[in-house]
């Protein structure tokens, strides 16, 4: 929840101090956060501190994470946009999205491999990762704060809300789909939790691969306009979730891939459309805030939806969010067409 107030604030700092500076701050916060997390875990495991003290250290670690790491993705996106230039903005955003997808794909594999060494080895890896990133980033040229063009606003306006609503609905739909995988798979595997866990891992891996394909095949070559991407994303997301309602396992996998492919098209599309109206730093910050709102909305709805006892209830709710997303994209298309 700390992402909500901190993301827009960091967006303003990007415009004031430059994106590289903000990325370095975010990496520093990332390193401090996981150092505290590892320290608290070790102290509690060895009995050096009471559980209350150890829990306090872990809470402080998460607070540091929420207040600083919220700057990471927006700052990286703006940095990539500024270095790429106006003609390659979509490809720049696709590069950042590709990095995130690779992290989702290989992160769990790295963690599983590190567990062979020690139960806390994944935390050690997270402590070392920001130091390695800092070494690489310090050598890259930074970009000075960019003046905001007169046609762009520096503050949020009512006209920008459809783009933020798209971001919120996308995050909510994807979160509910991921949380709904295990309940939905009980239709095929009943209470076999081991098999269900394996299937969820395969589905999440497939989701990351589908997103990578979208980013390399569609986004990086810049084959479609942002509005066309947004409309395509709505259709693909709704279609994918509708396919996932089927009981056949192969259709469930197909639907997950179609959904993830469509979702990968959406984020660069609404970010580019918003950046045409709002300063890059402010736009990235508000979109990050909207994504967090989507995750929060999902967290609020999950207990209510789960009470229905229907195995695919969360998938149905995700489909509803995707349909709303599609309706908003049509509204954006009509607004752009009228201009």
Feature map (PLM): residue ranges:
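C-terminal ends and interior cores of transmembrane alpha-helices
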Residues: 29-51, 236-247
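Short amphipathic helix-loop junctions that connect adjacent transmembrane helices
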Residues: 179-199
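C-terminal transmembrane helical hairpin of 12-TM major facilitator-type secondary transporters
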Residues: 226-269
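Intracellular juxtamembrane helix-capping segments at the cytosolic ends
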Residues: 71-84, 264-278
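Central cavity-lining transmembrane alpha-helices of secondary-active solute carriers
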Residues: 1-12, 202-217
């Amino acid at each position: 929840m700390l992402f909500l107030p901190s993301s827009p604030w960091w967006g303003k700092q990007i415009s004031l101090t430059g994106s590289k500076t903000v990325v370095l701050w975010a990496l520093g916060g990332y390193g401090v956060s996981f150092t505290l997390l590892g320290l608290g875990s070790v102290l509690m495991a060895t009995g050096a501190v009471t559980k209350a003290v150890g829990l306090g250290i872990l809470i402080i670690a998460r607070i540091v994470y929420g207040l600083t790491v919220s700057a990471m993705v927006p700052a990286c996106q703006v940095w990539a946009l500024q270095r790429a230039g106006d003609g390659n903005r979509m490809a720049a955003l696709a590069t950042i999205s590709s990095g995130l997808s690779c992290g989702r794909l290989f992160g769990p594999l790295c963690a599983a491999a590190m567990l062979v060494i020690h139960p806390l080895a994944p935390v050690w890896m997270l402590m070392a990762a920001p130091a390695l990133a800092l070494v690489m980033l310090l050598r890259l040229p930074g970009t000075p704060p960019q003046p905001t063009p007169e046609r762009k606003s520096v503050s949020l306006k009512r006209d920008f809300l459809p783009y933020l609503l798209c971001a919120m609905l996308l995050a909510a739909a994807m979160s509910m789909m991921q949380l709904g995988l295990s309940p939905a798979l009980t239709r095929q595997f009943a209470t076999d939790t081991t098999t269900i866990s394996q299937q969820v891992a395969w589905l999440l891996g497939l989701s990351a691969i589908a997103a990578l394909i979208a980013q390399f095949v569609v986004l990086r070559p810049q084959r479609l306009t942002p509005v066309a991407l947004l409309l395509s994303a709505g259709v693909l997301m709704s279609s994918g979730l509708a396919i996932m309602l089927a009981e056949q396992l192969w259709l469930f996998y197909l639907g997950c891939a179609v959904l993830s492919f469509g979702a990968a098209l959406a984020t660069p599309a609404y970010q580019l459309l918003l950046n045409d109206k709002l300063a890059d730093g402010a736009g990235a910050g508000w979109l990050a805030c909207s994504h967090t709102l989507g995750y929060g909305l999902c967290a609020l709805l999950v207990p209510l939806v789960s009470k229905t006892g229907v195995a695919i209830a969360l998938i149905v709710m995700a489909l509803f969010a995707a349909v709303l997303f599609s309706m908003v994209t049509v509204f954006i298309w009509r607004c752009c067409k009228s201009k």
